[in-house]
């Protein structure tokens, strides 16, 4: 498997392309709340991906140095999801809750699709 540090720029660019599409959808359609929710969720998803890569790097360094590794940031990811829900509940006319949740799951889907595509290219 490729090192996460090498994969992260590719995943980040995919997510940024999705964000650009969502911004276009927000600007040119009447589904503003849905696209605003996707933008919010996907932006926080990108933060979660960046945090995950950073935590995995720290985890690997701790193992290499023989130290006890720290957590990989599960609490931070849960807190990010809670923040998204609080923002969505605070502004229900601006953000659509289901699209925020879908946006939060974006980086998982992007990772899986990238893994499948990269495995197909190697064959």
UniProtKB/Swiss-Prot annotation:
Write down the InterPro entries for this protein, in alphabetical order: ATP_synth_I, ATP_synth_I_Bacilli
GO biological process assignments: proton transmembrane transport
User: Where does the record place it?
Assistant: Cell membrane
One Gene Ontology CC term in the entry: plasma membrane
Q: Which family does it belong to?
A: Belongs to the bacterial AtpI family.
Q: Which UniProt keywords apply?
A: Cell membrane, CF(0), Hydrogen ion transport, Ion transport, Membrane, Transmembrane, Transmembrane helix, Transport
Q: What is the lineage of its organism?
A: Bacteria, Bacillati, Bacillota, Bacilli, Bacillales
- Pfam family of this protein, just one? ATP-synt_I
Q: Which domain of life is it from?
A: Bacteria
Q: What does this protein do?
A: A possible function for this protein is to guide the assembly of the membrane sector of the ATPase enzyme complex.
How would you describe this protein's topology in the membrane?
Multi-pass membrane protein
The regions listed as transmembrane in this protein's record are 15-35, 36-53, 72-92, 97-117
Recorded source organism is Priestia megaterium (strain ATCC 12872 / QMB1551)
What this protein is called in its record is ATP synthase protein I
